[in-house]
UniProtKB/Swiss-Prot annotation:
Domain S4 RNA-binding: 352-418
Chain residues that bind L-tyrosine: Y34, Y169, Q173
Role, per record: Catalyzes the attachment of tyrosine to tRNA(Tyr) in a two-step reaction: tyrosine is first activated by ATP to form Tyr-AMP and then transferred to the acceptor end of tRNA(Tyr).
Record EC number: 6.1.1.1
PROSITE patterns hit by this protein: AA_TRNA_LIGASE_I, S4
GO cellular component: cytosol
Domain of life: Bacteria
Positions contributing to ATP binding: K232
Location in or out of the cell: Cytoplasm
Protein's recorded name: Tyrosine--tRNA ligase
Length: 418
């Protein structure tokens, strides 16, 4: 199985400009290719991971990746299938975000070894050297307005309005391809399927300006089995930055993937061999309640993104919380595992009587209910049941001198911080 056949088998090929020619190029020698990442935030997220891992698969097959950080295009904003104009960021912010994204990409691509080691480029380096007049003369003249208006990504915005700034974005992305081809002999661009219009602007410019053929391959935008856009948890992006989405939260995200998606995602997001995945699928279908596919997915992706120690910690947090063993976890581990539960910062004037604190922290709705909860054995401090109405919270209840975990019943948690 050649690399293109493997990508297809994993569900990673959505569209290509000329499949036969691309397969020929990939099987006959080393291909230099690029994927672009606009710094629209200070971290990449799971939505980017499909293209990143596809790039890594091609590198493992001997081809040479260029990771383009859009320091210039990030200042403009990509209109592709967006309902409204993006807010423009300052140059300083985009530069800072660009540096962070560069660091994240080095986790996945090999920038150090072999003749196909990855290269980092930033399109601000060339766009900052081009005057507006030169850009119109040397690039703009190759694009008709009719051609630009025909792009689906632009059509969607015509009714609501699109600025010239965003309208020109596709020409800038097209010029990226031309520049990388001219300087580095890059002949293939990889990106999400929503980028097709912008990406083919590059092949058009290559053909008209340099009389060369470039290839485009898009990866699918991943949705779950209900059609919902993938990569968000409770409406929020799942970030690759551990400070924005902890390894535990990422672990839980994968653990909760629906059965109908789990095996497909193993093909897309892991480097397990396809025959290994087929074996996992057989075991998974025989006992879905054991969630083997989801557990494997969580292990592989968290290890890939954050390392084996982070995976082991996420697994330990999961197991200890499930068992109610609060005291077996550090304060930092509890902050990860209980990041979504109510948090109350204890004030110096607060009563430390347990009944009072249950009401103050919003755990019980009233003192009467709080007393009943304590007497009925429904209240736990750091996993231990407390039934003393006169119980006073003390330093002994602080884990690592930072927090106390209170549970009401089986599932209602609250964290007291000091």
């Amino acid at each position: 199985m050649n690399i293109f056949e493997e990508l297809k088998a994993r569900g990673l090929v959505f569209q290509t400009t000329d499949e036969q020619a691309l397969v020929k190029a990939l099987t006959e020698g080393q291909v230099s290719y690029y994927t672009g990442y606009d710094p629209t935030a200070d971290s990449l997220h799971l939505g980017h991971l499909v293209a990143i891992l596809t790039s890594r698969r091609l590198q493992l097959a001997g081809h040479k990746p260029y990771a383009l950080v859009g320091g210039a295009t990030g200042l403009i904003g990509d209109p592709s299938f967006k309902d409204a104009e993006r807010s423009l960021q300052t140059k300083e912010t985009v530069l800072e975000w660009s540096d962070k994204i560069k660091g994240q990409l080095s986790t996945f691509l090999d920038f150090e070894n072999g003749d196909n080691k990855a290269e980092l480029v930033n399109n601000y380096d060339w766009f900052s050297q081009i005057s507006f007049i030169d850009f119109l003369r040397d690039v703009g003249k190759y694009f008709t307005v009719n051609y630009m208006m025909s792009k689906d990504s632009v059509k969607k915005r015509i009714e609501t309005g699109i600025s010239y700034t965003e309208f020109a974005y596709q020409i800038m992305q097209g010029y990226d391809f031309y520049e990388l081809n001219d300087k580095h002999n890059v002949t293939l661009q990889i990106g999400g399927s929503d980028q097709w219009g912008n990406m083919t602007a590059g092949t058009e410019l290559l053909r008209k300006k340099a009389d060369k053929t470039g290839h485009v391959m898009t990866v699918p935008l991943i949705t779950d089995s209900t059609g919902k856009k993938f990569g968000k948890s409770e409406g929020n992006a799942v970030w690759l930055d551990a400070d924005k989405t902890s390894p535990y939260e990422m672990y839980q995200f994968w653990l909760n993937v629906m059965d109908d998606d789990a095996v497909r995602f193993l093909k897309i997001f892991t480097f397990l061999f396809l025959d290994e995945i087929a074996e996992i699928e057989t075991q998974f279908n025989a006992a879905r309640h054991e969630r083997l596919a989801q557990k494997t997915l969580a292990r592989e992706v968290v290890t890939l993104v954050h390392g084996e120690e982070a995976y082991k910690q996420a697994l330990n947090i999961t197991e200890q919380l499930f068992a109610g063993n609060i005291k077996n976890l550090s304060a930092n581990e509890l902050k990860q595992g209980l990041s979504n539960v109510p948090n109350y910062h204890v004030q110096s004037e607060d009563s430390l009587n347990l009944v009072d604190m249950l009401v103050t922290a919003g755990i019980s709705p009233s003192k009467r209910q709080a007393r009943e909860d304590v007497q009925n054995g429904a209240i736990y401090i750091n996993g231990d049941r407390v039934q003393d109405l006169d119980y006073q919270l003390s330093n002994d209840d602080k884990i690592d001198d930072q927090l106390t975990v209170i549970r009401r019943g089986k599932k209602k948690y609250a964290v007291l911080t000091y």
